[in-house]
């Protein structure tokens, strides 16, 4: 069967631009009998792990659409011009180069509205393990042909041709040869993208010019889509994201179309072509069989590799040459002595016995040390004890960690799990471990908000600044927010009515248990394990919402605003923005910038791990939660007032007056 490999594909990790979840890309490939897909999100590789998981049975290729500065990337003079260049990892070494490239592009000295590099800096990573192709109308080669990027809005080929450089052939040839020299003769391809030539005549003109350059230089061409959603009909949902991104609505877009005014991201509002097409559709768009066949050549150049790993615990610096297991044993012996007053008090007041404590401690110790978790408990204990040594208040124990007697004996928690009949298995279930990988415990540690930065500094000093970083998290279009975005884009109702409608859509946290049951059922039925908050609200607040939308006996959504509710359900779960995770930090064995992309967090000015918590853990990294709790700050403030007599003095003065 004739086929091709889509090499230029965006997921929802291209925030408010790409719509598709990795699972939707995989489904589309299976529908079209395509062998796999690349993922080339804008300036990031944050979706690599989830994409590889979703592409089970298909070939995933990890790539990135880089932002290339035409000048020295350290110069920030108000010029925001950037070229687009797609780069793919051929193998595991190629992945490491992508990590290094995205990390460097996010350095504060290079980041300027977008993560960016210049070609000279990019060249040092092109050691034969990367494949590059030239890019679309926003590429370096396109800028060598057209002297004005107003070419995007040209209505005819004649208008576009009038914007070409007289010496475009020499300019483009020189640029193409430079890129081939950077990446290597067999690793650079000229990208032919004609999916939207009818709406953008400049695309057809660009393709003609690039094909000429290909013949002149011998650099082969490849055909690509510029997929921002999986299917043509998904275009309408992607436009909701675009309205959010450029703060507009469909009414304004239509008015601009009529008046001829420029529309930001206008191509997406005029076309449904930015999907993953079939081979036959790519031919209909105007690609040649050779260009499509060359995509399979590229795919065959890319090896299979696995980014996941069993946990790689950092080594705790134990004293006196002891192993981590020996040192943990020593601390537990001392902790047992220190906790005797509390343990004996519990024994005297309850039915529990000292033997029960010993058996539980030995059981936990065997389970945790047998799977090599001694270092983890030493790391957690060290952080807590250091904070207390600095006079900081810490929490008594949060969540399932209170079910560990080891943590209680060490003094990490102050909740006796035997006294309160708490289960160790809720904290750590060894039955989840496999021969390939073990699961890590999850200990949430509470600290004063005002002192949290000192904790982070201590951890960085202890394990090395290059091995410790906070991580990013993504906000998603979910429930109430998704419905509001759809209603705003359609100018469907007043702000006040919008609030009345969405008041009946609960927050995710309020119905987390119910949603989890829906997700599990969806998985059992062959789905992706997803659950819609909006649909849950329609089912459970039917009377409240029926004037706007309701579910009929056949399970279909009806009512005056049914289409908007359906669209909001479709975009639920789409990633919307990124920020620094409130609590999670990564402590890694390896230098972080070598194993995961480091990204620039604009709000804090910090460089953080550019992947989500679960993905980082899947790669073998250790996550520690350092939570800031305002109540601890208040308690410390009250203690200080008491300590220095201020509170007593104020009370006396108040009483005397």
Tell me the role of every PLM-derived stretch.
Residues 1-657:
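Alpha-helical scaffold/interaction cores of sigma-54-like transcription cofactors
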